[in-house]
Amino acid sequence: MKMLDNIGLVLEGGGMRGMFSAGVFEAFMQADIEFPYATAVSAGACNVVSYLSRQPMRTRKIITDYVSDPRYCSVRNLLRDGSLFNFDFILKEIPQKLLPFDYDAFRQSSCNLYVGATDCNTGEVIWFPKETMGEDFEPLRASSSLPFLAPVVHFQGHELMDGGLADPIPVEKAIADGFERNVIVLTRNPGYYSTENYPIWLLKLWYAKYPKLIEIIRTRSENYNRQLALAEQLEKDGKAVVIRPLEPLTIGRLYRKPQELLKLHDHGIECGLALIENIRRLAQK
């Protein structure tokens, strides 16, 4: 693969909308390019690992074979385990038994991956390097644990939740780590701005123990829109290539109909391939 020196890869989350990002990674593999650095949260982190392990169409096969399986996502899981998504099934049984993940290739990848999760006590993002993953992918579990739909994850002395709360589009992390030029993969169309918000009474009821977490959830839309504006400005300044869906998506975070998800994956491949030459030009600056 052709290493794009000094170009970072920045990945937002988005739940099942992350199938768009997975398609973009397929385009990168088809174009035979790789990045020395990636920073990712939530679904972006979960999907990029198959790109780093060089396993084409692996994420697509997960969708065709398992996304409709109640073990993957169901109210039963939520009632039984407190998590809508069964992360033991997703992060252990699938990669270790059902659809083997190439852990050795992942570990040997030249890409320095950092996965972000939100510290519930401080409201700040904690970054976990690729070397901390292990075969249980605990940082991925933490980064993908959505408010109200998953329990707090305890890892390395931290109480953690969805990385997209504290750092939804982690381009500032990439810049701080020395990558002034970045490819930024989003899961929302041009013109989208976040207006999400949770009732404050519900946050205080559910997360009374974590006032800093409540504050970061309450201000997430403002933070998202600020980071989105930064990404778009970097693109205008010739310091970034932004890849995102061309039209508004009807697919939400929890969408589970395979055919529509596969169409989104195809769209990601299409959008990724369309911008490969732009990415190569960015690397030559």
Locations of the language-model features?
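Patatin-like phospholipase
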Residues: 1-41, 49-285
